[in-house]
Swiss-Prot record:
Binding site for a divalent metal cation: 99
Similarity field: Belongs to the class II aldolase/RraA-like family.
Organism: Pseudomonas entomophila (strain L48)
A Pfam family matched in the record: RraA-like
Protein name per its UniProtKB record: Putative 4-hydroxy-4-methyl-2-oxoglutarate aldolase
Assembly mode: Homotrimer.
Source organism phylogeny: Bacteria, Pseudomonadati, Pseudomonadota, Gammaproteobacteria, Pseudomonadales
NCBIfam families according to UniProt: NOT-MenG (TIGR01935), PRK09372.1 (NF006875), PRK12487.1 (NF009134)
Gene3D superfamilies xref list: Ribonuclease E inhibitor RraA/RraA-like
Annotated substrate binding sites: 76-79, 98
Amino acid sequence: MQHYVTPDLCDAYPDLVQVLEPMFSNFGGRDSFGGQIVTIKCFEDNSLVKEQVDLDGKGKVLVVDGGGSLRRALLGDMLAEKAAKNGWEGLVIYGCVRDVDVLVQTDVGVQALASHPMKTDKRGIGDLNVAVTFAGVTFRPGEYVYADNNGVIVSPSPLKMPE
């Protein structure tokens, strides 16, 4: 597992990276994570999140535009454990998570706005692999995202940690 330090990446690639507005907190078992972006756009319905974490996620980060909802949790312990089992590097969720005491022990990165105990509906509503914009940045499928306790950054191409 690669360790990322976003301040070092920002120093090394200042003209390449975009930095998200500082509104995310780390809820996962990994202090840092990064990888190729897979996007989901959904609102209080995590059907597509459930589908994607069942797939091979090696080298990938699931970026979920949940509309910033603070009323439902788009990720909980069961889906986080599936994501870890299937090799996902992490998830960046513009929305809430739950089961935070379990998430912090799960080997997957999770950045989200807050915790909320209520689960979502599963109506099969949402879009996969579309450009999504939140926190002042547009995420495009196939680009790259890196996260740690300092923040979250996006790059059009993969970044290497400076030596």
